[in-house]
Amino acid sequence: MAAEGRCDGQTVRRNFQSSDGVRLSFLEAGVEHAAEETTTIAFITGWSMPASLWQKQLAELSPSFYALALDPRGQGESEVPTFGYTAERRATDIHEFLKPFSKVILVGWSLGAIESLQYIQMFGTDRLAGLVLVDSSVGEEPAPGPGGEGGFLKELRKDRDKALTQFIHAIFKTKRSNADLDELVRGAQRLALNDSIALLSYPFPRTHWREITHGFTKPLLYVVTPQFESQAHNLQKNRPGTQIEVFRSAGHALFVDEPERFNRLIEKFAKGLP
């Protein structure tokens, strides 16, 4: 893996090449812990979003942990190829990202959560110490309401710029600067429309994700906003031992809206691992 440069006093950006020849970028912090027997925390971001959204997690967790955040293909600072926008390929990218590490807590947000589940289904759990799923459906009841994702796809096809702008403004409840929001919109526009839609159209039934989640035998933390609260309680009932946490005042990007609370939760989860 090649270093590209420092992003701030703690965080370094690096790149590696996937097995299908794509340059993938990631952020790392706490590199002094990399050679130790400490836990590695790896963050997988959501649809169209960059790894830099995890900046406060990298900064605040790196004094105790080796922390990494991946820019998936087509997102952030990673290359934007014309291929590979399937659950299987994105899970393979995660597998190749995690190859150098062991005792990993994998933290997946939104689309990154189901791609983390696909990684587990394809490659197993040998490298994982625990799993954190953040504000994503996991196939439990109740299913998301009608018109949600399908309606959004229609809006994307109709007026992509407007749909992206509305989506990005809606995922935060804390105030973000217009410059920051505009930068996120521009970043999301790097990916071709059809490829961005493909990422929201994985051809799996809801039971696929539920079965993977139920079959995961290591510690699991499910962190949600109220939209998934009922799923969280059902997962805890159907998969005893699941830890859940509800962020009632945060937006979909809850780790950005309430970083201190989220970081304490991750640190507590990590320190409680067997």
Per-region residue spans from a language model:
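Conserved HGGG/HGGXW glycine-rich cap/lid loop of the alpha/beta-hydrolase fold
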Residues: 22-79
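Conserved acidic catalytic loop of the alpha/beta-hydrolase fold
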Residues: 88-104
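Flexible "cap/lid" loop of the alpha/beta hydrolase fold
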Residues: 117-160
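Conserved alpha/beta-hydrolase catalytic His-Asp/Glu region
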Residues: 142-147, 157-215
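Conserved serine/cysteine hydrolase catalytic core
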Residues: 193-246
